[in-house]
């Protein structure tokens, strides 16, 4: 999934969010609908960031013609949770440049944004994420990242030194 060239234009958008976005949800629905078919992936009875991240990421894993957008208070919890799913490459973006670079270099397939950001900024970030194409850059690095997913990592050991 990560090796596909091109942009996310025309793909299905799986959208997950938590309670922080609920008051302005209609505005986000409208903004996202300008870019394609939006499928809300939330548990309407429990607007919890982990539940939304799980629903969006499992949908993106099984639907190669899609990508995800996750929005919570800061975007950090969603990005941490999303990156635990095999084949998901989530990026928390706080600027248009972040969105462009995570697509151009890392071919991210899930965008994480902060509900606490200015709406106009988030709209610009979303547009950049969707319209920026992955062109095949840094392929060796992406292959290495993909190998991390299946690796059995040894536990980290802390080394304490006294002065």
What is each stretch, according to the model?
Residues 52-74:
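Short, structured active-site "lid" loops
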Residues 36-49:
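A short beta-strand-loop structural module common to alpha/beta enzyme folds
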